[in-house]
């Protein structure tokens, strides 16, 4: 693809499905987006190039060392901050935003204090990694020995929350502080993996949840002086949202925006990075995203009306 003459090129750390979708979103606007494998060869970066990432953490290679510390890497310091659950939860506490009670688990002598102050039942999570249900343990006094000595200092303990359901919101912040938000999306997880996302602005509690979510995510993005798309996952407990996870990037719960909104989350991220004019985000219709995992490709899916198929052959 020939580089754009209208806008600076955007280089993406990571060449997975999110990087590919960013590249597709840039094409109609003549924005050259180049996803990069971590082990790709080093090259001379154009002076006006913009760097972003499709993932919070990356392996150390000559290319990631060059781009990951480059002055043109937007939100450079945010990725490491939010990739670590300890610093992420500390940020939420600093901003006085609702999240599950938690603590850093340093050694086994803490267990009595944890069960007293955090909860009788806790979820122990690795500080980094451990997504899609991996690197997480449900712990009570009866199975605390499941957390081995090598994990202490590398995990946090959160109170187990018997939530009603899960939602997420995706928003973007521009350089001047303006923000745009998609409607709150309802998510169904199975074994810690997102399987369905449903968006419908007529859902009960949608308006109150939207106000809460926009306020919380907006406060976070302002504090970080963030530019681009960020996702926030929440537990719903009664009429209250508890923040579960933040992702400083485009997010799988926002895939519905590719067909359900005039501006997808991928295009929105590029618009924010390049500081392009952007109207309010209006959904076209109620939308559903189904995450096809561990299933064979079926060409009959293409017969489904008013749908798009995105097949990227990701292994389970």
Task: Give the ranges of each region predicted by the language model.
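Glycine-rich nucleotide phosphate-binding loop and flanking beta-alpha elements
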Residues: 19, 58-59, 130, 163-164, ...
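Active-site "cap" helix and flanking loop/linker of ATP-utilizing ligase/carboxylase catalytic domains
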Residues: 211-232, 248-295
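A short beta-strand motif that forms the metal-chelation/ATP-contact edge
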Residues: 240-250
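Peripheral (often C-terminal) accessory segments that flank ATP-dependent C-N-forming ligase machineries
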Residues: 6, 94, 271-316
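Short acidic-glycine loop/turn motifs at beta-strand connectors
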Residues: 173-178, 236-240, 293
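Active-site nucleotide/adenylate-binding loops and adjacent lid/helix of ATP-dependent enzymes
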Residues: 83-220
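ATP-binding N-terminal substructure of ATP-dependent carboxylate-amine bond-forming enzymes
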Residues: 1-90, 109
